């Protein structure tokens, strides 16, 4: 019985912290393309210093931009 209460309490605390944190979701979607602007300033040294996860994100951005489904909302 105690373990069920503990699990429910943990779940509620995670949900509250997720949905009521001011930084959990962006206030507006106007800044969605700032990451694309940041990619313009990359040089070879930046790419060599990147972590593998950063390279995966760059690859995802490139695939999205090459995709036919991507629409520019600006």
UniProtKB/Swiss-Prot annotation:
Residues 1-24 form the signal peptide. The keyword Signal applies. Expressed by the venom gland. One of its GO terms (biological process) is defense response to bacterium. Keywords: Antibiotic, Antimicrobial, Secreted, Signal. GO terms for cellular component: extracellular region. It is found in: Secreted. Belongs to the non-disulfide-bridged peptide (NDBP) superfamily. Long chain multifunctional peptide (group 2) family. May be an antimicrobial peptide. This is Anionic peptide clone 9. It comes from Tityus costatus (Brazilian scorpion).
